[in-house]
Amino acid sequence: MEKQVKNYGRSIREKLLNITRDSGQRYQYMYLLARYFNERLLYRVSVSQYKDNFVLKGGSLLYALDGLDTRPTVDVDFLAEKISRDREYLEGVFREILSIPCEKDGVTFDIAHITSEPITVEKKYPGTRFHITALMDTIVHNMSIDIGFGDVITPCPESVDFPMLIQDNPSINLQAYSIETVIAEKFHTMIDR
């Protein structure tokens, strides 16, 4: 008979601590927490009606391609496609996405206190950064989501299975930048700066 979990958040916290211990402290606990919260945000995007409107890019994509050995990323980056650029509209979209329940992951998001600000205002298509708070058991974690617009993906977005820290959780499949676009964007950033 399977043991009934009463507090998924506490159980996940213990599992993440075990991963830290089992790695010989190679993975710092706070980095694993940040990755876990990013992962569970991505899960909600992947099962939402907006999953085809947000294409994963940036550090979270590099993590998906390379696994645990990449540097930790504190935000999640998306290219938005076929969706309004209006900040208030996007805020409503993310309230809807972040309210998708997933009891087994132990995470909830404070959808009442999402804030946003414009980013990359010097570009032809300015983006938006959302600041959100994730909660798990007694842990409160602040994170951000950067949304960009107008980039070209060559040849086209690819389907990516996002690696899971805790295998018991529902899996994540997202649209993501192609590796060619990742490399081109990195070169463009180096030249632009």
Name what the model sees in each region.
Residues 1-193:
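Compositionally biased terminal segments of proteins
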